[in-house]
Structure formats: structure tokens, C-alpha cells
């Protein structure tokens, strides 16, 4: 941790990944696990993650060894996910909704066909598609502005 006080009363942090305050932690390593989990959360639920929720999932990945696909799989069991993506939703509709949630646009025909066919043929699961799209360079760019000042979360402290 290196802090440099400037003449304008601004602290500059160098080589710092996390800053802990009394009420939260701010993850500055937005291209690491916190950024990955944030992008997945945003894509799955079409909203910014709540501090408690993202703190739990960051912990599960960093301390528990969960992969993004495993996190996405657990998201699919939540009531919120099932309200957004009904069980009878077609693969094409699911992929289209994920593109809209994550990238803010309709899928291009190649992407739609690739992911919908992968789901139909059993080459990928919905959690895998969710993780794939969330990890895409385009989604990283879309979310970059949202996390430019870090990712706020509450650390998971319960085992």
C-alpha cells in the first residue's frame, strides 16, 4: 500500500487491489475476480449486484475455488433468475435476453446461432453461455465504465 498526498489533498493508491473502509470494501482489481463476478451478476440479473451478494460470490470464487460457470449455475437456481428466465423460455429467447442484459443490444446472427445451437445440441448449458457472454471482451468494455472507480462490496465473513 502506497499513498501519496498531493498538494490538492488527493491520495493516490499504487499497486492496491482492495481498500477496506469501515462500512465496505472497494475492489480496484476490476479485471480480476471482482470484475468477473460483477459482469456475471449484471448479466444474469440485469442489475448491479447488491453489496452482500457480490461479497459472497467473490468469496466463493477466491476462497472456495468456485468457477464462474459454477457461480452462474447457482444463479440459475435463484427465484430472481427464474422470474427473469422462465423454464419454458426457448434457447433463442434466452440468448437474446442475455445479449440485451449484458451488451445492451440484440445478438448478431452468428452469436445467436452459435449459442442457441450449442444449447439445443447440449454442447453448452445455460450457465456456460451466461459465463461465456459475461467474459467476452465486449461485455468487459460495456461494464468498464460502471466499475471504473472500483466495485463496492461487503466481505463475506461466515465460513
Protein language model regions, located:
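Acidic, glycine-rich low-complexity segments
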Residues: 1-25
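Substrate/cofactor-recognition hotspot
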Residues: 17-159
Amino acid at each position: 500500500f502506497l499513498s501519496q498526498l498531493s498538494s490538492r489533498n488527493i491520495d493516490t493508491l499504487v499497486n492496491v487491489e482492495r481498500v477496506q473502509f469501515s462500512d465496505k470494501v472497494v475492489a480496484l482489481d476490476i479485471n480480476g475476480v471482482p470484475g468477473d463476478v460483477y459482469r456475471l451478476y449484471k448479466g444474469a440479473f440485469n442489475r448491479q449486484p447488491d453489496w452482500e451478494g457480490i461479497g459472497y460470490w467473490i468469496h466463493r470464487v477466491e476462497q472456495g475455488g468456485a468457477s464462474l460457470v459454477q457461480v452462474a449455475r447457482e444463479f440459475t437456481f435463484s427465484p430472481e433468475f427464474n422470474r427473469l428466465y422462465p423454464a419454458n423460455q426457448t434457447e433463442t429467447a434466452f440468448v437474446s435476453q442475455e445479449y440485451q442484459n449484458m451488451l445492451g443490444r440484440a445478438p448478431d446472427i452468428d452469436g445467436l446461432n452459435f449459442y442457441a445451437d450449442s444449447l439445443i445440441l447440449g454442447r453448452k448449458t445455460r450457465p456456460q453461455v451466461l459465463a461465456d457472454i459475461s467474459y467476452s471482451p465486449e461485455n468487459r468494455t460495456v461494464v468498464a465504465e460502471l466499475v471504473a472507480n472500483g466495485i463496492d462490496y461487503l466481505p463475506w465473513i461466515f465460513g
